[in-house]
């Protein structure tokens, strides 16, 4: 009854785990009505968790990866109870795997965006992720070398290891969009640059979940990210950084941002 009451449900990935708790309780108690409630909640939340491009809503690449794992498990549990995974969920989950492959650095590690640790990307998240996780030994490369995700990521890379080792490719990721909160930082407008086998511009990434920790507070701020600062101009901390133009050809990847 507690999990069925909407007022007890929180947000984001915490809500996902509550819904899964309801799935398990419903299965044990053979309560089909409660199971259907959990199913409807999962379907509704998934539409906001991953958009049609496959971008996650938490503002951190590490949480993009974790949500792929959590939701794959969630839909597997739903299937085990005899329910069908919604077609849109299948499509968005696959798009999310491809999006993660684009975001991962050429050396196979996660870019430190938002609350993300500097770790290798996990295998087993689809053929595109396996490709970057194994330096091209398994899986297959995604199509294209540049993409702009509406949820605030521009990704540009020199290639997928066809003319040189994958780890020697260049990679740039730029953040834009509105203030996401959740596990994001004040990093809109920041630039991440990897080339010649190493990261040259990187951000603070995950430090701690302790909200009163002054070091964590600093690592969330614009000052801890690769953002152009103009001291003489006023800036609104939570203002949107909009993508004014994005063009990708075989020769040029071009983007223009407007920091309000």
Give the location of each predicted region.
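Active-site lining segments of carbohydrate-active enzymes
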Residues: 1-62, 72, 130-142
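Short, solvent-exposed loop/turn segments at secondary-structure junctions
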Residues: 10, 161, 179, 207, ...
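Alpha-helix N-cap/helix-initiation motif
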Residues: 11, 56-60, 182, 210, ...
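Catalytic-loop motifs flanking and including active-site residues across diverse enzymes
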Residues: 18, 67-70, 224
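Carbohydrate-active enzyme catalytic cores, enriched for enzymes
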Residues: 23, 51, 55-201, 251, ...
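Active-site rim segments in enzyme catalytic domains, especially the processed small/beta chain
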Residues: 184, 188-255
């Amino acid at each position: 009854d507690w999990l069925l009451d909407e007022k007890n449900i929180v947000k984001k990935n915490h809500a996902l785990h509550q819904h899964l708790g309801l799935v398990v309780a419903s299965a044990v108690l053979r309560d089909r009505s409660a199971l259907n409630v959990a199913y409807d909640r999962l379907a509704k939340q998934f539409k906001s968790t991953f958009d049609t491009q496959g971008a996650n809503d938490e503002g951190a690449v590490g949480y993009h990866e974790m949500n792929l794992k959590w939701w794959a498990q969630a839909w597997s549990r739903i299937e085990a109870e005899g329910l069908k995974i919604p077609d849109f969920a299948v499509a968005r989950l696959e798009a999310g795997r491809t999006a993660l492959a684009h975001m991962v650095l050429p050396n196979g590690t996660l870019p430190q965006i938002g609350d993300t640790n500097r770790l290798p990307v996990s295998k087993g998240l689809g053929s595109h992720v396996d490709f970057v996780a194994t330096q091209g030994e398994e899986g297959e490369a995604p199509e294209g070398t540049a993409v702009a995700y509406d949820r605030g990521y521009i990704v540009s890379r020199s290639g997928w290891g066809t003319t040189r080792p994958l780890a020697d490719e260049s990679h740039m990721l730029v953040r834009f969009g509105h203030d996401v909160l959740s596990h994001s930082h004040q990093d809109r407008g920041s630039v991440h640059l990897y080339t010649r086998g190493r990261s040259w511009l990187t951000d603070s990434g995950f430090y701690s979940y302790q909200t009163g920790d002054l070091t964590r507070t600093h690592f969330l701020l614009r000052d801890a990210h690769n953002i152009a600062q103009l001291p003489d101009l006023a800036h609104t901390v939570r203002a949107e950084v909009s993508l004014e133009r994005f063009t990708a050809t075989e020769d040029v990847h071009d983007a223009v941002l407007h920091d309000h």
